A protein has these predicted regions:
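Chymotrypsin/trypsin-fold serine protease catalytic domain
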Residues: 120-123, 135-209
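Protease-domain processing segments flanking chymotrypsin-fold serine proteases, especially trypsin-like
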Residues: 1-77, 256, 260-265
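Catalytic nucleophile loop of clan PA
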Residues: 205-231
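Catalytic Cys-His active-site segments of thiol-dependent hydrolases/isopeptidases
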Residues: 83-87, 106, 174-176, 224-234
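Acidic glycine-/aspartate-rich tracts in secreted/extracellular proteins
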Residues: 89-90, 108-111, 146-149, 179, ...
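Conserved catalytic-core segment of clan PA serine endopeptidases
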Residues: 45-57, 68, 96-97, 101-149
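C-terminal cap/linker of serine protease catalytic domains
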Residues: 229, 233-265
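Catalytic histidine site
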Residues: 51-109, 191-195, 203
């Protein structure tokens, strides 16, 4: 379990309130297998940012108060403000509500937020997650805004594009922020099929805090951007073994969530 039992969330449980329940309705029995992407293969920033770590600056840590507890990444959108993470990073699931007071620090490392902290809002998860904590729908979207910003988040750090209906076996780059580390963990390996609605990958050193970390295929070695096909989550909230991670399969339900998020930003 990558986040729900972390000391970070326990310490701030008193501030977790029920948010607005933005939901969509999708047929869970009719899974699309047609590959779909959200845009071009490489939504690069307007100017190349410095890359002080092995991770893409489009990946960052989610914070509540002064502690990071999950991982998120920027996904391409016309507005340039959309984040992708695990549903359990922004919503408590069955019987719970949306978390509040979240901020996002893209490119975070060594206690430094090189692009500042961005307020997370407009969180969105599928009804199957909010009603029953369905591990096959452990995917969430949100938007990120910074007071006084003159450029969009995506124009500063770039963005991965979203793909649905992808192959189960693909070479990926996996990135996540362990909650006991100030630098991101990065691993490259090939995914496999856990079941009809779940992916898995073996990558050592992805413990609590890495939930929501993106699974990126076709990473550009210069920009470190590519196409995201999953996030750490799903089965056992991403897995109870830090050396094996899981993701809900990105299908038409995920695409519908993305489209609903971009339609209201």
């Amino acid at each position: 379990m990558r986040v729900r039992r972390s000391a970070v969330l326990l310490s701030v449980a008193a501030i977790l309130l029920v948010g607005a329940a933005f939901v969509i309705f999708a047929d869970r029995q009719d899974r699309s297998t047609e590959a779909t992407t959200s845009g071009t293969a490489d939504a690069a920033p307007a100017s190349a940012p410095d890359l002080p770590t092995a991770a893409s600056p489009a990946v960052g840590a989610l914070f509540i108060e002064d502690a990071h507890y999950c991982t998120a990444s920027v996904v391409h959108s016309q507005q340039g403000d959309v984040l992708l993470t695990a549903a359990h990073c922004i919503h408590d699931g069955e019987g719970g509500g949306y978390l509040t007071g979240i901020s996002f620090a893209p490119g975070y490392h060594d206690g430094v937020a090189p692009f500042g902290y961005w307020t997370v809002s407009d969180e969105l998860v599928a009804p199957g997650w909010s009603a029953s904590s369905d591990p096959d729908l452990d995917v969430g979207f949100a938007t990120a805004h910074q007071a006084g910003a003159t450029r969009s988040l995506e124009s500063l750090v770039g963005a991965n594009t979203l793909a649905t209906g992808s192959e189960f076996e693909q070479a990926i780059t996996l990135t996540g922020y362990p909650d006991d580390s100030e630098v991101p963990a990065v691993c490259r390996n090939t995914t496999s099929r856990q079941d009809a609605y779940q992916l898995k990958v073996d990558c050592a050193g992805f413990p609590t805090g890495t939930s929501g970390g993106p699974w990126v295929v076709g990473e550009d070695p210069k920009t470190r951007l590519g196409t995201v096909i999953g996030v750490i989550g799903g089965f056992e909230y991403g897995g109870d073994d830090p050396d094996t991670s899981y993701s809900s399969y990105f299908d038409k339900d995920v695409l519908a969530l993305y489209r609903q998020t971009t339609a209201r930003t």
